[in-house]
C-alpha cells in the first residue's frame, strides 16, 4: 500500500502530533532501552554459539561473516539498493547494530570511507566473525559511538546516509532526523526504513510495555522531516500485513531521497 505524501515547509516545526507519536523520552528511559538492546545481542552472540558457526563455515555450510538482523529483509524491500551509485566517497550508517546494512549495500560497490555509528559499539565490536567486527579489525570501516543526537560529523559531508530500523531506539527522534538531514551532502542519498505505530497499535499492552523501543513514529511525521529537503527516489509504505511485525505496526516506511 502506498500513502499520499503530505507536504510541509518546516522540518523543525513538530506540530499537531497524534498522541501515539512519541518523539523523545527521558534519558533514563533511553538508557533502559539501550541496556535491553545490549543484553539481547550479547545473548545472541555467546562464544559457544559463534564457535559452532565457525565450524559450519569450515565445512562449507555458511559464508564467512555471521549474523543478520532483518538486513536482507530490508534490502529486498528497498530494491536491493539498486539506486545507490557504484562508487561512494563517504557513507555512514547510523544505529548500525551488530550486523549493519552497509555490509549488503557495499556488495559490488566501492565505498572509499565507510562509517558505522552506534552508541553500543563497545559491545558489538567484541562479537567475533561479524562483518562489522571483522571489517573494523582489518581497518575497512571507521566507527563512531556517539548517540546520533550528538553526531560529531560536519554538515553536508556524506554522500550516503543510512537510517534503517533505528528511530524507535533513540533518545530524541526529532534530533536524529535533523542530524541525518544535516550531514547528507547536497545531491547525496538518505535511506530510511522504519516500522510505524498508530493509535490502534499503541493500545496493545505488549506494544506499550516494549522496553527496547521507546520511540513511536508514524509516516506523517517522517514525511514532515524528509519531504521538504529530499527528492524521493523511492517512497513506499508497506501495509500492516506486509511488515515484519503486523501485530505491532500498521505499516513500514521505505524512503530513499536525494538532498536538494
How would you name each of these model-derived features?
Residues 191-220:
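Conserved class I S-adenosyl-L-methionine
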Residues 229-260:
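Core SAM-dependent methyltransferase catalytic element
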Residues 174-189:
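A short glycine-rich, Lys/Arg-flanked "PGG" loop and its adjoining helix->strand segment in the class I
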Residues 160-171:
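A short SAM/SAH-binding and catalytic strip from SAM-dependent methyltransferases
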Residues 92, 97-150:
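Class I SAM-dependent methyltransferase SAM/SAH-binding core
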Residues 146-161:
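A short acidic, Gly/Pro-enriched loop at the edge of an enzyme's catalytic core
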Amino acid at each position: 500500500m502506498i500513502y499520499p505524501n503530505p507536504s510541509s515547509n518546516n522540518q523543525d516545526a513538530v506540530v499537531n502530533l497524534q498522541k501515539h507519536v512519541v518523539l523523545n523520552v527521558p534519558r533514563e528511559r533511553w538508557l533502559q532501552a539501550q541496556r535491553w538492546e545490549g543484553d539481547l545481542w550479547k545473548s545472541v552472540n555467546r562464544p559457544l554459539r559463534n564457535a559452532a558457526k565457525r565450524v559450519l563455515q569450515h565445512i562449507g555450510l555458511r559464508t564467512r561473516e555471521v549474523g543478520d538482523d532483518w538486513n536482507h529483509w530490508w534490502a529486498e524491500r528497498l530494491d536491493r539498493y539498486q539506486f545507490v551509485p557504484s562508487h561512494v566517497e563517504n557513507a555512514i550508517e547510523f544505529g548500525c547494530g551488530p550486523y549493519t546494512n552497509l555490509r549488503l549495500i557495499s556488495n559490488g560497490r566501492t565505498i572509499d570511507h565507510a562509517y558505522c555509528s552506534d552508541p553500543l559499539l563497545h559491545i558489538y565490536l567484541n562479537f567475533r566473525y561479524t562483518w562489522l567486527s571483522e571489517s573494523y579489525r582489518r581497518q575497512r570501516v571507521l566507527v563512531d559511538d556517539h548517540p546520533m543526537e550528538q553526531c560529531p560529523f560536519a554538515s553536508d559531508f556524506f554522500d550516503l546516509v543510512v537510517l534503517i530500523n533505528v528511530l524507535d531506539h533513540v533518545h530524541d527522534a526529532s534530533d536524529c532526523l535533523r542530524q541525518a538531514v544535516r550531514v547528507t551532502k547536497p545531491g547525496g542519498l538518505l535511506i530510511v526504513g522504519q516500522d510505524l505505530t498508530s493509535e490502534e497499535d499503541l493500545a496493545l499492552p505488549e506494544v506499550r510495555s516494549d522496553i527496547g523501543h521507546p520511540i513511536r513514529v508514524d509516516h506523517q511525521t517522517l514525511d514532515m522531516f524528509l519531504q521538504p529537503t529530499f527528492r524521493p527516489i523511492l517512497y513506499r509504505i508497506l501495509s500492516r500485513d506486509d511488515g515484519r511485525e503486523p501485530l505491532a505496526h500498521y505499516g513500514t516506511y521505505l524512503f530513499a531521497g536525494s538532498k536538494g
